[in-house]
Amino acid sequence: MNDIAVITIRIHPDLLSVQRARLEEEIRVFDGVTFARFNHGVKHWLNVVYNPKSVTSKIILKRVRKWDKNAAFF
């Protein structure tokens, strides 16, 4: 059975759409990440689905904080 975890990370709302797209791409390259997209209703929430045996939420958040040092789990 595959392990699956889901997290939502709050990013600064002023991040440009091109920056959000780039950030999604950067998160998707992690081994174990199957989904990384910004929420269509709340544009500053990044939803990530991943296998916690392959990558941790802390590693994902660390990468997101390169774009927004105040990013946090929601």
Where are these regions (language model features)?
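A generic structural motif
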Residues: 44-49
